[in-house]
Amino acid sequence: MFFPDMLLAAKEMVRVLKPGGKIAVSVRIVPEKNFWVTAIMGAINRNMELPAPQPGAPGMFRCAQEGLIADIFFRAGLKNIYQEEVPGILNCKTFDNYWDMQTEVAGPIVASHGNADELMKEKIKREVYQSVTQKYPDGAINIDSSALIIYGEK
């Protein structure tokens, strides 16, 4: 998702892999299945008017296109390529846990949010709180997510 040249990165992984070795990667799929990202990034983008990324630029959903990484693995020289969607749940328990994780750990979010002044940060937090608590009104913040696992052999 974040390598500038994904094919070059895959070829390097294959180069250092022992014959018969196996490699697996995980990438995020469509935003609609990853509310844990879109809840906060949507609020940041709406409020800070960030420019849209260039098509194909490194980013969270860059690899969401069906078959993209499998094709890169094939072009890098891997065989027996397999991919599978793996749903998950991010068990944050509380909104504060979710907020802290997103604003302290998630690199792209930390960078974007860090550029906001205190008033803007509070506005974004209120919007995200409203969005998250609307989706999970019982207070149990167990946020759906989904990834694609792609596997190949040398």
Cite the ranges covered by each PLM segment.
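A short His-aromatic
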Residues: M1-D5
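Conserved catalytic/acceptor-binding region of the Class I
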Residues: L7-K93, I109, H113
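Alpha-helix N-cap and coil->helix boundary residues
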Residues: F35, A52-P53, L119-K123, I143-D144
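Short amphipathic alpha-helical patches
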Residues: C63, G67-L68, D96-D100, K121-R126, ...
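Core SAM-dependent methyltransferase catalytic element
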Residues: A76-K79, W99-G107, D144-K154
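C-terminal helical/coil "lid" or tail adjacent to the Rossmann-like core of SAM-dependent
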Residues: N80-P137
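Short proline/glycine-enriched turn/loop segments at secondary-structure junctions
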Residues: D138-N142
